[in-house]
Amino acid sequence: MWRRIFAHGLKYDQPNASSKNLILSVLNTTATKREAKDYLSKYTNDSGQHNHCLFFIRDLHKVAPAILSQFSSVIKRLGMLGLRPMFVIPPSPTHVNIQAELLDSIVTEADLKPLHFKEGLTKSRTGLYHSVFSQESRFFDIGNSNFIPIVKPYVYNEETASEFMTKDVVKFMDCLCQGNIPHIDKFFILNNAGGIPSGERNDNAHVFINLSQELEHLSSSLSHNISTLTKREPRSQNLLHRMEVYVKKDEISSLECEYHDHLENLLLMDKVLSNLAATATGLITTVKAAALSSDRKNPLVYNLLTDRSLISSSLPRFKKKDGEIDSPANMFDDHAWYELPSQQVNAAPSNSDAVLVTTVLKKGVHIKTYDYKTLTQFNSIGLPKEFHVSEKGAKPSNNSPKLDINKFKSIIDQSFKRSLDLHDYIKRINGKIATIIVIGDYEGIAILTYEGSEENSFVYLDKFAVLPHLKGSLGISDIIFNLMFKKFPNEILWRSRKDNVVNKWYFQRSVAVLDLSIDLDPEHCDEKQSQFKLFYYGNPQYAKRALRDKKRLREFMRSVRDIKPSWENEKNIS
């Protein structure tokens, strides 16, 4: 399949046969056809720009030499795949020069040429900061240059003709990535602890973070954890609990430092990605994971080829076990709990499993939810007049978000490649809307309704749409499903055509799938041909009860089966 892609208009001028074979091999094992096209269009020599990845590596001096050698091979492989590395050394009173020497060896072993810069920033007499990436890019952001910048965390002050090590690494990195700098497509933070921890995943790393949505909550949670650890308070005044704090003081101190780094990593990601293109991606993982030779398991290589995490963040089978009690450190009680497989409570996370220690981050997209049961002219824009209501009664405030009906219809039309009968559709859903989720500027949308009997209704995903050019990118689908599962944690149903190529993705996010063509009630011959399958998601408690209740199942299936599509000229399809 990939050979046909290369043969028809997607040129990739590789310097040698081994690198071409590498690309073919990796694409065959890790990427979809769409991802392959996206990768080739971005990272080919014909794309007209040089793509860089910015590395920020903590405690490199603590990493075993064998791991460093493997990491050097990964750096070389990233370069062959079209991503040029750039390194920034974290500030440290004692280890900056050691880290510089180690990076020099890593770059040299990768057959590249290290280019050392002592000052990353220059502070002008006017107080403005100028980045070495902008001032000195002529040395490394050109043609087939093999020069790789290694930047120390120093600032040169023009007014005093002196230099100093930065004390604010977040501000340093923020200024470093401003101005006319080379195109940075990836920002990688490597350390010994891995990605941002999630209490719901037994302190394994979050899979994906949409910073626009989650930064405030996560930074607050991390700060709260740090505050809790700083107090060194025993669980009670019991003598054993007080002794526990004393005996484990070194462990607590180490954990406190680790959480400080996690918070700093989160803030670094937000500042750096804010200065880069909207498509730029951040990734936090361990040096050990980043050094893995397997292209399927190496989070850096995999993200380069697919622009996503090693696994999806919206898989509902990956959840905390029922009845599991949170530890005092699990402060993330407002984030999705179904991101990854739970482990035994006493089982330590394996640092060798890249899935458990890797977080992918995007600056992300803004999200709006419209919890209006009925659409009116007061909560929407462009609503057909037949759905206008009397001005009597309560109106939403002027600050309440209004749904743009024209954009609402446009994204559905584009995503499904057919025209929505707007009047028929609004007539069907009005009065029973559960919520409408809108991603960005109507780049993704989900319309959920209440179906079934009034006394025993259920939540139904009526429409799920993403703009065609964004399908598979930015994690929009995962973001929408995460929000749905969080907003309606008990159960959600949806249907899909039997031949829909997305059904495998739907299947992974459901706990049951039923064919709507089956006879729902043999005694009364309730059988109709249907081109749809029913997908059911529910937490274990609800799912166990609903899937064993034949009457409830019949209500699910009959209600969903008998919904008439609201496409123009297709209302008789079922």
Curated annotation (Swiss-Prot):
The gene is ARG2. The keyword Transit peptide applies. Belongs to the acetyltransferase family. It comes from Saccharomyces cerevisiae (strain YJM789). This is Amino-acid acetyltransferase, mitochondrial. Its EC number is 2.3.1.1. Keywords: Acyltransferase, Amino-acid biosynthesis, Mitochondrion, Transferase, Transit peptide. InterPro entries: GlcNAc_Synth_fun, Vertebrate-like_GNAT_dom. Residues 392-560 form the N-acetyltransferase domain. Pathway: Amino-acid biosynthesis; L-arginine biosynthesis; N(2)-acetyl-L-ornithine from L-glutamate: step 1/4. Residues 1-13 form a transit peptide.
